[in-house]
Amino acid sequence: MKKKLLLLLPAFVFAQSFIISNIPLPKTYIQNLSPLECNTYCMQNYLDNGQVFSFLAYAGSKLKDAKQNEARELFVPIFNLGSIHNSKQLKIALLLPYKKIGKYASSVTNASLAYLMTKGHPFMLKSYKIESENIEDLSSVIKRIHKDGFEYIIAPLTHTGAKNISNLDPTIHIYFPTINKQDSNSTSPYFIFGAIDYHAQSNLLLKEAYEPLVIFSDKSKIGKALAAYQREEFSYSSIDDLGSSSLFGNTFSIFSQINEESNKPIKQTTKEILNYSVSRRTTNLESYLKENEKIADATIIVNTPIIKTGMILSQLTLYDVNETNILSTQINYDPLLLSMTQYIDRKEMVIANSITEHNNILIETNALLGNDIEYDWINYTTTIGIDYFYSLITGDERTYNIKIKDNQMLYDIELLQPARSQFVRYIRPTRERDFMQKEQREEDQ
């Protein structure tokens, strides 16, 4: 026992306590002493020769060259470079109904933190957790946020929470990464909506659809809503317009849809549409698929989560459905699809994706925090919102070139296919059946 005490004695004698200092790290400022200008070629030459500080002397703001700007964004946090906006306070609050949004309370926080960490600007990011989204809780927390001196809020709320905040009508800037403006009646100039547009994605996908259209959905709100919308939209005769922007794999701009809204055609009700609602516990689709002539050569739409989608794809192959193609919105843009399904099951699949702008520095910084902004659209739209607020507060140019119209972020849409090991751009095949189906409808009329 004495020996043990003697062995522990040095540990007690030389023990130290470690407290994190509240003194901020010193900033690095690079002064450009050269009277000469430096163009893109000149700056690239500095990078190629490892003259990092000479490069940074000319890189005081966002650069036009994407690769050079990426290098600049990498060096700013490494050297803790000082910002010309150092005097401005950068304070952003996170309003988190953690019981409602689950894991996203953490991932939204990480996405916000990852973005601000790359900017080299002093910031205060504070989380305000609430148990419910009722008006009383929201009113109380917004008053507290305002009292604490915050004027910008990231609020990943459900539709109920967004509706209640809209009724409160606070005069404070709020960004909703989970809500699309078409799902809100708010006219507040202080609200910005950041969610992707499932309707626009469905419209683009339906241009690739054939009759009969078979819609598989789960019993969730989004599954039911998408099924109802797609069924309604496919009933319009011009939805299979041959002028689809995906013909050569081009990215579809949301503005083209806005311009076409006023030209919606007369409803065509003769199209054959089948709607199957699959419960969470259902694992066998034999009754839907086996020897079902109604779905031969059909277009299949899957409005189901990734696990359920994998089950549907495998059973489409098992029961020799011989579908023409399989369509899905952002729900199934997930690398898990590539590993959990066979290529033969997914080779005819087309997925709409609105995560079209990528910043490698932010992707890698998020990855260090165990976060994903490359495939998870809520984390991605959160990053877009933080970027927007950062630009408003500091006056810096935005990192992402996402347009805003009527307080809604407008995301371009691309159509992708899950190939053998990655998602690739979709190129529409020859569509002879379009003309055959059109002629058949004209004969029927």
Annotate each predicted stretch with a short phrase:
Residues 2-5, 9, 16-445:
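Extracytosolic ligand-binding ectodomains
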